[in-house]
Amino acid sequence: PGMCVLSFAFNGEKDNKYLPEHIEKNSVCYTGTHDNDTLVSLLKNMSAWDKNNFVAGVKNSLKEMNAGGNADTDEALCDAVIALGFACKAQLFVLPMQDAARLGGEYRMNEPSTDKAQNWSVRIEEKYFAERTAEDLRSLAEAYGR
């Protein structure tokens, strides 16, 4: 199956194969992988040009997929990317806890080709599990049949 990473989808290219509306059923969709930065950190560190493309792409995908949500704030943008992952046709959607809880780059799982002490040692404190409740994720799962 194809591996579709939404963090790479919204770069301004309308034919980008990672756009949620282009994802095929026989694939796995992720907001990001263990080697990507978190959504929050990705948005924080983007150039203005990249951020404009990202926001425009998310807004377009929300419209194309008839998914609720908006991209008016960084928090809403993260929520919209997550909703698009749930809404896409991929057989499987993987949502890293770092993105579900809207955590920053200090919670990145791994930075390839580095020997940082943080690599593979990330632990998420219990308090972050309350930030985005199971009910929020259950609602998305039910809405999109996951």
PLM features: residue spans?
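Catalytic cores of glycan-processing enzymes that make or break glycosidic bonds
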Residues: 1-146
